[in-house]
A protein has these predicted regions:
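Short beta-strand-loop/turn "lid" adjacent to the catalytic site in phosphate-handling enzymes
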Residues: 73, 77-125, 146, 152-161
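Adenine-nucleotide phosphate-binding core of ATP-dependent small-molecule kinases
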Residues: 268, 275-279, 286-322
Length: 338
């Protein structure tokens, strides 16, 4: 059975094609569609065992982008399947499932409506994730679709860890609480790490560190998420590439008032102008920060020390919270390569 996996962003589509009939799942191809909606779009298709294929043309929307992906998958030269009939299901990464979805689920009209209802608290991700689902309905009608939510794994957090000490009515009215993200990654690496280490996942204390341009850390107690560094949004927690992580809210309101910033401008500052980029003034990429660090750039030194210091702080906090730790697992671009 061939599965197509999609991660749809606002102007991009990441995809993988996996053969699940093999004794162990086998990657057939992966690729990336970029610059959707811009005058010149790009498709990079990487079939396993074949030459990489690139296409450059306008890609006005996600439906067009996914159609180009399907054409590449069945191309006589660059393709990996003979017919689209071989694609039996499509899996979608969906950033935010709120409190609706403790597990992955088949996509129905009701599921689509719940994803849509979360647009306000996940405006950067959920609209594009839903667009991918709707596009598949157009180009692969009748194929089963599964939504895999970043937030699902963290639905086991105890209330003491997911509630904020704000007036309780805001949780009741607006769902203001810690949701956590990167849950699919944390769940997978905790289980794989336990297998490699010979640990019983159901009787273990594991700390998983997903460190990339965005990053989060999770305390996994007996196989379940017990605490996690991201909060109501992915801006909370670690010092990330362009996201600030933990910060006193009063500092944010003070800056907004002094700079006469709108809500959108404040949100942009926290999400896109802060983190190691904001502190260093050099880059959001840790490879660039490392080079500047080695050159003695004082702000790059400060940014890197803050970045790694916050990781150590959360690891220590979660070890104390669980009463010890059996294993620490690193994943993500920085976590795996730094």
């Amino acid at each position: 059975m061939v599965i197509l996996v999609l991660n749809c962003g606002r102007s991009s589509i990441k995809y993988q094609v996996i053969d699940m009939e093999a004794q162990s799942s086998k990657l057939l191809a992966k690729g990336l569609v970029e610059r959707i909606g811009l005058p010149e779009g790009d498709l990079t298709h990487k079939p396993v065992g074949k030459e990489k294929f690139e296409l450059h043309q306008p890609i006005p929307d996600h439906t067009t982008g996914i159609s180009l992906v399907l054409q590449a998958l069945t191309d006589p030269v660059h393709g990996v399947i003979r017919s689209l009939d071989e694609v039996k299901a499509v899996g979608h990464r969906v950033a935010h499932g709120g409190e609706f979805f403790p597990e992955s689920c088949l996509v129905t009209e009701q599921v689509q409506e719940k994803i849509r209802s979360l647009f306000q608290i996940a405006p950067l991700h959920n609209p594009a994730n839903l667009e991918g689902i709707l596009s598949i309905e157009k180009v692969l009608p009748g194929v089963k679709q599964v939504a895999v939510f970043d937030t699902s794994f963290h639905q086991t957090l105890p209330a003491t860890n997911f509630m904020y000490a704000l007036p309780y009515e805001y949780y009741q009215k607006y769902g203001i609480r810690k949701y956590g993200f990167h849950g699919t990654s944390h769940k997978f690496v905790a289980r794989e790490g336990a297998k490699l280490a010979g640990l019983d996942i159901n009787n273990s204390k594991i700390i998983t560190c997903h460190i990339g341009n965005g990053g989060s850390i999770t305390a996994v107690l007996n196989g379940k998420s017990y605490d996690t560094s991201m909060g109501f949004s992915p801006v909370d927690g670690l010092v990330m590439g362009t996201r600030c992580g933990n910060v006193d809210p009063s500092a944010v309101t003070f800056i907004g008032e002094k700079e006469q910033m709108s809500y959108a401008e404040v949100n942009n500052m926290l999400n896109k102008q802060s983190g190691v980029f904001g502190v260093s003034g050099v880059s959001s990429d840790m490879r660039d920060i490392d080079l500047a660090y080695d050159e003695g750039n004082p702000r790059a030194i400060l940014a890197r020390d803050m970045h790694y210091g916050r990781i150590r702080k959360f690891v220590g906090e979660y070890a104390a919270e669980m009463g010890g730790v059996d294993m620490i697992v690193f994943t993500g671009g920085v976590g795996e390569n730094s």
